[in-house]
Amino acid sequence: MRERKITPTTRSIEWLEAHGWTVDIVERRVPHAFITHDAFGFGDLLCFKSFPDRGQGPWIALVQTTTGSNMAARRTKILAESRARLWLQAGGRILLHGWRKISKGPLKTWEVREEWVTL
């Protein structure tokens, strides 16, 4: 039986929601083309979460999702984007999610690497 194809974006939505984030997709697909446009040039998902146990107000974040092997390229892209700097200065956060398949004996499982992007 073949494994169904799940995108990094779908994996991140499921992971974030399981960890208490409220999530929405903000990347746009171009009709009749195989291209997507990220929000502000770097965001696939917009999410927010409150941290009452930490005594902190809610966080808002844009999430860039990718494969584990493509994280460095995505980080470089984000850091080169002037709107990313403005987003961070305005109090938003940027989270980079890199997904990779790992083997645990006969089982194959997906693992996320999270990286908060800062100036």
Language model features with spans:
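Catalytic phosphate/metal-binding cores of nucleic-acid and nucleotide-processing enzymes, i.e., regions
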Residues: 1-119
